[in-house]
């Protein structure tokens, strides 16, 4: 059997087709402040890919076709549209500093401090999520919880979620992207 994943320009553009339509958007943070060029290099080095990268400026860079499966969230999440938002995510340790404001949030039932996305990033993410929801017929909903969803909950989910909802090993995007969508009118819904 031949490998269906073919590397082109460093990303897996000829990946298998997604289920039609993709069931959800998966929000991530990059864990670094570099732009889409740096994100591209890191993804290639790690054998990963995403559909979009959200720059600090608010620009959204499309990295893969929407009908292709990208390797961004393990087997459960890779059926969704992956969106990496440029941010270190967590405040740097001294003596380093960040120009981003800090925000209190929770992840997997624990309090944490994360770095806020820029207002332009939040606006771009919301606009992209709205466009994807319209295109794929998703309800405008996010999980009302910061816990890992069960496999059954993931298989039934439609709308947006974050990487932290798919595995206990990840904390991105700290419920910040779900929060931005709720402020824009999306509904927090129980995944049960």
Predicted regions and their residues:
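Feature marks short, surface-exposed loop/turn motifs that line or immediately flank catalytic pockets
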Residues: 33, 89-91, 168
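N-terminal catalytic cores of peptidoglycan-degrading enzymes
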Residues: 1-77
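Basic/polar, cationic surfaces and motifs that engage anionic cell-wall
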Residues: 3-7, 14-18, 93-192
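Peptidoglycan-targeting cell-wall enzymes and recognition modules
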Residues: 42-121
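Structural preference for beta-strand elements that scaffold enzyme active sites
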Residues: 24, 80-82, 159-161
